[in-house]
Amino acid sequence: MGDQRGTRVYVGNLTDKVKKDDLEGEFTKYGKLNSVWIAFNPPGFAFVEFEHRDDAEKACDILNGSELLGSQLRVEISKGRPRQGRRGGPMDRGGRRGDFGRHSITSGGSGGGGFRQRGSSGSSSRHTERGYSSGRSGASSYNGREGGGSGFNRREVYGGGRDSSRYSSGSSASYGRTGGQSAGRFRSRSPVGNHRF
């Protein structure tokens, strides 16, 4: 009994001189054939289907590399749609590289820009916040470090404008009053202390 579908054999490296009858006459020596098909567009290969797989394998072993009408034959068992497998691999690998690149560009563009923006004002703004809370820096020192339009934007973000001017005037006034009162009390007490001794 033959195989249910037969076994197809690929025959390559054919010249224009090789015809269907030539292949059929050569391959039928090794077993019963179901069909012989020669490609014309593009030319150069053919398929020969054997009824029995054992006969097909024997023909491949003997005829592969042999010469027929000036053609050095390439004869092997047909593997079935090998082109799709080769085409699928590179497409998958190429698709994965395009997504990481786009992802890298997108994330790098937005993330890097945000990082540079934070980095340009992050250290000075953090020092400025500590300066406001401790009452040692004031608005004048903040403006001196930053200066220009960038200082104006950051004063709005970190409580500048009226708040900074009110704080600077209030802190200087309170500091002056405190310093004056403490100095006055110290001077007023020192003569009394000396008089007692």
Swiss-Prot record:
A GO molecular-function descriptor: mRNA binding
Listed Basic and acidic residues bias regions: 89-102
Domain of life: Eukaryota
Localization, UniProt: Nucleus
Chain positions with Phosphoserine modification: S168, S171, S174, S188, S190
Modified residues (Phosphothreonine): T106
Residue ranges annotated for the RRM domain, each copy included: 7-80
Disulfide bonding pattern of the chain: none
Chain residue ranges for the region called Disordered: 74-197
InterPro entries for the chain: Nucleotide-bd_a/b_plait_sf (IPR012677), RBD_domain_sf (IPR035979), RRM_dom (IPR000504)
Gene Ontology biological-process annotations: mRNA cis splicing, via spliceosome; regulation of alternative mRNA splicing, via spliceosome; regulation of gene expression; regulation of mRNA 3'-end processing; regulation of transcriptional start site selection at RNA polymerase II promoter
Keywords from the named record: Nucleus, Phosphoprotein, RNA-binding
PROSITE patterns referenced in this protein's UniProt entry, alphabetically: RRM (PS50102)
Main location: nucleus
Gene3D superfamilies: 3.30.70.330
Role played: May control important aspects of development.
Name recorded for this polypeptide: RNA-binding protein Rsf1
Naturally occurring in which organism (per UniProt): Drosophila melanogaster
Gene: Rsf1
